[in-house]
């Protein structure tokens, strides 16, 4: 898999090794308490939805990997319905990016349906 497909999300499953920890100590930044956190999650089954719901209710954004399921899978349809309901309840947003990711946002954050470069 080339670098561009990794950046743009082309195919293949992701692991925690695909995410690189960046050392911010080399940068002069003001590091206060963040009002929002971004969580990465994997959805293997219905039980994984609880932690995602809790994170969104707590005001955090979640990017969930759904590569273990097909989007036509009845379990996945039920999971997506549950997450849609959470997004509605908190006045957030939810989108599915390709066949491998779902992004769920908390109150006050919407997701543009248009690419920046396209």
Swiss-Prot record:
Gene Ontology terms describing biological process: cell division
Could you tell me which InterPro entries the record lists for this protein?
Answer: Cell_div_SepF/SepF-rel, SepF-like_sf, SepF_arc
**Which stretches of sequence are listed as region Important for localization in a ring-like structure at midcell?**
1-12
GO MF? identical protein binding; protein homodimerization activity
| Matches recorded under Gene3D superfamilies | SepF-like protein (3.30.110.150)
Task: Specify where it is mainly localized.
Answer: cytoplasm
List UniProt keywords, sorted A-Z.
Answer: Cell cycle, Cell division, Cytoplasm, Septation
Consequence of gene disruption: Depletion of this protein leads to formation of large cells with a cragged cell surface, which are unable to establish a cell division plane.
Location(s) in or outside the cell: Cytoplasm
According to its record, what are the GO cellular component terms? cell division site; cytoplasm
Give the superkingdom in one word.
Answer: Archaea
Q: Does the keyword RNA-binding apply?
A: no
What job does this protein perform?
A: Involved in cell division. Probably acts as a membrane anchor for FstZ2, tethering its filaments to the division site. May be involved in septum closure.
Binding partners and assembly: Homodimer. Does not oligomerize. Interacts with FtsZ2.
Q: What is this protein called?
A: Cell division protein SepF
- Its source organism is Haloferax volcanii (strain ATCC 29605 / DSM 3757 / JCM 8879 / NBRC 14742 / NCIMB 2012 / VKM B-1768 / DS2)
């Amino acid at each position: 898999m080339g670098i561009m497909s990794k950046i743009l999300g082309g195919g293949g499953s992701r692991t925690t090794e695909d995410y690189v920890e960046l050392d911010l100590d080399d940068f002069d930044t003001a590091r206060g308490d963040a009002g929002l956190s971004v969580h990465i999650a994997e959805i293997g089954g219905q039980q994984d939805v609880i932690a995602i719901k809790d994170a969104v209710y707590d005001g955090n954004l979640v990017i969930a990997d759904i590569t273990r399921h097909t989007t036509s899978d009845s379990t996945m349809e039920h999971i997506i319905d549950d997450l849609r309901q959470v997004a509605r309840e908190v006045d957030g947003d939810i989108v599915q990016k390709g066949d491998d990711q779902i992004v769920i946002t908390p109150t006050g954050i919407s997701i543009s349906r248009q690419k920046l470069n396209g």
